Design a protein with these regions (language model features):
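A short beta-strand submotif of the Rossmann-like class I SAM-dependent methyltransferase core
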Residues: 125-128
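A short glycine-rich, Lys/Arg-flanked "PGG" loop and its adjoining helix->strand segment in the class I
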Residues: 138-150
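A short acidic, Gly/Pro-enriched loop at the edge of an enzyme's catalytic core
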Residues: 113-123
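Class I (Rossmann-like) S-adenosyl-L-methionine-dependent methyltransferase catalytic domain
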Residues: 1-55, 61-114, 132-136, 155-231
Length: 231
């Protein structure tokens, strides 16, 4: 199932987690946070915000209806956010409201060819790589790296079957029947910190940490593009 064609259609409705910064979550966000074992507000404030400056240029993969996008834009008041998605997200994200600070790219593959080289300080995704097999993930990391500045940071949530085993499949809302099926037939393909780290290294990134420890069910990796660190 985690083929590019499947991903293009499965989330075409635009995934929406609500306002990730509100102190009181919506019902949808509450259910997601219960499944993942984390607070989205804490994920943003501790996992992403420390890497954002007012003038940062950020690349976001798979924004959906913009839950994380709006949080990012609230921090990069003099910077830019470029989003990449298989669907046209402009109706949901409304880039015209941001005076050129938000650029939405609709793409057909994982080449990142629509984006300029050596342009971004931060590469972010949440709820995206968990639905990609490790081969797709490595392709994404390889091709996106050319768009990043030297020393740029990447932060990505991804599925971690080792943590999922400890957390509980039912609690994590992932069908335990997936254990017996190949990755091609499931929407939560096999991954863990070792596989993810290997894919990132193969793609040319340096690993800051394979997991920042903010999620109970999944992991969040922090990578650095070789060069002078940007903090």
């Amino acid at each position: 199932m985690p083929t590019i064609d499947w991903l293009k259609t499965e989330f075409s409705y635009g995934y929406d987690s609500g306002n990730v910064l509100s102190r009181i979550p919506s019902l949808t966000r509450y259910r997601e946070e219960k499944a993942i074992g984390a607070s989205y507000r804490r994920v943003f404030l501790q996992g992403l915000a420390p890497y954002l400056k007012p003038n940062s240029r950020v690349l976001e993969l798979g924004p959906g209806r913009g839950s994380w996008s709006r949080a990012i834009l609230s921090r990069i008041t003099k910077g830019e956010l470029h989003t990449v998605d298989y669907v046209d997200v402009r109706e949901w994200l409304e880039p015209s409201k941001y005076s050129g600070r938000l650029v939405c790219h609709q793409v057909t593959d994982n080449s990142f060819s629509e984006l300029p080289d050596n342009s971004f300080d931060v590469f972010w995704s949440f709820g995206v790589l968990c639905h990609n097999n490790i081969e797709n993930i490595e392709t994404i990391l390889v091709n996106a790296r050319s768009t990043m500045k030297a020393g740029a940071i990447a932060i990505h949530q991804y599925g971690d079957w080792s943590k999922l085993d400890r957390y509980g499949w039912e609690k994590g809302r992932v069908p335990e029947a997936f254990r017996e099926k190949p990755d091609a037939d499931i929407w939560w393909p096999r991954n863990n910190q070792e596989k993810m780290s290997r894919a990132a290294i193969n793609a040319g990134w340096e690993i800051e940490t394979p997991d920042i420890g903010l999620l109970a069910r999944d992991s969040m990796i922090v990578l650095r593009n070789p060069g002078t660190k940007v903090l």
